[in-house]
Regions:
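P-loop NTPase motor core
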Residues: 1-41, 49, 79-192
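Phosphate-binding loop that captures ATP/GTP phosphates
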Residues: 49-75
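A conserved SF2-helicase RecA2
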Residues: 191-199
Length: 199
């Protein structure tokens, strides 16, 4: 499945929370393919999510927090940070590590797919991710909401950027994270599951 939202709404932070929660429950690694933000920012969010610390608190006792983080996650979160992640590299890394979960932040930017139109490229990417999930483990991707999702609390499948059907058709579940522009709600997020074939 995938999580989508407008830029700077909290997709990476949300996935960081999910990954750190799951990491302590498995003996197999969680592979996080990051082609969106600086890898160090993702790593800091993972530490903050796991330990419940602000940035100043995290950096006040770096060595102790590193130890606590590794104990809590069992060292199971492996971050692959590259602006150009190719499908062949992903397949090789998955076979090598046999992960319990794979995260693509952002799945739309995975390279190695060709088609005549962008929506067909995205369809192939999401179909490929679905096949990986069948063969190996659950896959979670992130992508953007289009401009119609700006200021919308409850995002639906129609707000997914660059595709009205191709991405949505391949997902077992879709979670939209909305954010209102109303005063006093800047820090509030609104979660809407617009597709769920798991139940």
């Amino acid at each position: 499945g995938f999580v989508f939202a407008r830029p700077e709404t909290g997709k990476t932070t949300f996935l960081s929370h999910i990954a750190t929660f799951m990491a302590g429950q498995t003996d197999r690694p969680i592979l996080w393919f990051n082609n969106e933000e600086q890898g160090e920012k993702v790593r800091v969010r993972s530490y903050q999510s796991t330990l419940g610390l602000t940035t100043p608190q995290l950096f006040k006792h770096v060595d102790d927090n590193e130890r606590r983080y590794l104990e809590a996650t069992k060292g199971n979160i492996l971050l692959y940070d590259d602006a150009s992640i190719y499908r062949g590299d992903v397949e090789t890394i998955i076979k090598e590590h046999q992960p319990s979960l794979v995260i693509f932040d952002q799945i739309d930017k995975i390279r190695g797919f060709d088609a005549d139109r962008p929506d067909l490229v995205f369809g192939r990417i999401y179909q490929w991710a679905r096949e990986l999930a069948k063969l190996h483990c659950p896959i979670i991707g992130t992508c953007q909401s289009d401009g119609t999702g700006e200021g919308v609390k409850w995002l639906t499948m129609s707000h997914v950027a660059e595709a009205k059907t191709s991405k949505q058709a391949e997902a077992d579940w879709i979670l939209g994270i909305g954010k209102s522009n109303e005063g006093g709600t800047e820090d509030v997020r609104f979660f809407n599951i617009s597709k769920n074939k798991l139940m």
